[in-house]
């Protein structure tokens, strides 16, 4: 009998949520997603020190002589994300998602500039922009930046998405793909209610993604829905049939070892049609987010967490840069 993972792969595009190249080799997904926390975890792995060194060297060569260390490290953050993305693309047939610095989440212009820069870095390696999804936080400013980028042919993946309002704003902006989070919504409800067991269709994260998916299919939106941030395999099974699901290696492994029948829960050929067409201008969007305590808290928490991961990655790169310089000094004496 086919494993649950094999069955899932036949009805949903399975995406690996990792920067671990060995895990990608093992599970052979079509697409892969990264974020600052995943890149940081991979960068700490001694197996990838060569990749870090290449990123630092490339950054040094791309900047004029005499630039400050802070400018070099800022450039290296972009380069290391692209270097990991490049290596991932060598292992998959589809797309990789590379995230814009989360500290730019409330700056439309800076987000657009950073995204263009990342695409140009990929282009320097001969990688077509069709294979890249630029990940941007689902703030109002992020959605507006993505709307500009999409018109330039730069495809975007809007992340840290926790409610219906964010999703619809992305669809109306004709964004390529959204990543509605599941597990982080569950985390919030567990804390707020004191209830630990939200199983199957009762899982608030599953309910959120199902609502978004069904509305998108009812209205014929082209924006792809990729469920993300899972806490258990039951959440994944409840979203079988979703356009895409991005799954951490530990759950890919668990699903690959499990047998039994997987039931398709989401269907793009949905029969019921919603009579309501939702539109959110900036005022409506901000009010909706303000009124949604869960979405507001989780969006803020996510941006803060990814920002801290970038800062830690900067420290790691600076430390490695100093080590390389010291090695050169020793070799020269």
Swiss-Prot record:
Annotated GO CC locations: cytoplasm
UniProt EC number: 2.2.1.2
Protein's pathway: Carbohydrate degradation; pentose phosphate pathway; D-glyceraldehyde 3-phosphate and beta-D-fructose 6-phosphate from D-ribose 5-phosphate and D-xylulose 5-phosphate (non-oxidative stage): step 2/3
Catalytic activity as recorded in UniProt: D-sedoheptulose 7-phosphate + D-glyceraldehyde 3-phosphate = D-erythrose 4-phosphate + beta-D-fructose 6-phosphate
PROSITE patterns: TRANSALDOLASE_1, TRANSALDOLASE_2
Database matches in Gene3D superfamilies: Aldolase class I
Keywords noted in UniProt: Cytoplasm, Pentose shunt, Schiff base, Transferase
Broad enzyme group: transferase
Main location group: cytoplasm
Residues spanning the signal sequence: none
Coiled coil stretches, renumbered: none
Compartments where located: Cytoplasm
Lineage top rank: taxon: Bacteria
Keyword Nuclease on entry: no
Example GO biological process: pentose-phosphate shunt
InterPro entries per UniProt: Aldolase_TIM, TAL/FSA, Transaldolase_1, Transaldolase_AS
GO MF entry, a single one: transaldolase activity
Active-site residues from the entry: 135
Subunit structure: Homodimer.
Record-stated family: Belongs to the transaldolase family. Type 1 subfamily.
Record NCBIfam families: talAB
Function (record text): Transaldolase is important for the balance of metabolites in the pentose-phosphate pathway.
PANTHER family tied to this protein: TRANSALDOLASE
Protein name according to UniProt: Transaldolase
Species of provenance: Prochlorococcus marinus (strain MIT 9515)
């Amino acid at each position: 009998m086919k494993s649950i993972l094999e069955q899932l792969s036949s009805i949903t595009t399975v995406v690996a949520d990792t920067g671990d190249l060995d895990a990608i080799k093992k599970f052979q997904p079509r697409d892969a997603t990264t974020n600052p926390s995943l890149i940081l975890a991979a960068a700490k792995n001694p197996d990838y020190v060569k990749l870090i060194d290449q990123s630092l060297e490339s950054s040094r060569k791309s900047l004029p002589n005499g630039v400050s260390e802070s400018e070099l490290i800022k450039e290296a953050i972009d380069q290391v994300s692209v270097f990991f993305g490049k290596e991932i693309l060598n292992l998959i047939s589809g797309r990789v998602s590379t995230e814009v610095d989360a500290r730019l989440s409330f700056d439309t212009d800076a987000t657009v500039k950073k995204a263009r820069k990342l695409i140009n870095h990929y282009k320097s390696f001969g990688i077509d922009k069709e294979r890249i999804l630029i990940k941007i936080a689902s703030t109002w400013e992020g959605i507006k930046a993505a709307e500009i980028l999409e018109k330039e042919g730069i495809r975007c993946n809007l992340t840290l998405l926790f409610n219906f309002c964010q999703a619809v704003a992305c669809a109306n902006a004709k964004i390529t793909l959204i990543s509605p989070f599941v597990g982080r919504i569950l985390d919030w409800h567990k804390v707020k209610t004191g209830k630990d067991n939200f199983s199957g269709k009762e899982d608030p994260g599953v309910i959120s993604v199902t609502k978004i998916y069904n509305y998108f299919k009812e209205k014929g939106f082209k924006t792809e829905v990729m469920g993300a941030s899972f806490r258990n395999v039951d959440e994944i099974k409840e979203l079988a049939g979703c356009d895409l699901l991005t799954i951490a290696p530990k759950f890919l492994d668990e699903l690959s070892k499990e047998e039994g029948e997987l039931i398709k829960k989401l269907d793009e050929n949905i029969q019921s049609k919603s009579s309501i067409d939702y539109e959110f201008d900036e005022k409506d969007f901000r009010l909706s987010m303000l009124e949604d305590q869960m979405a507001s808290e989780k969006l803020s928490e996510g941006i803060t967490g990814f920002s801290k991961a970038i800062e830690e990655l900067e420290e790691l790169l600076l430390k490695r840069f100093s080590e390389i310089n010291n090695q050169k000094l020793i070799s020269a004496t």
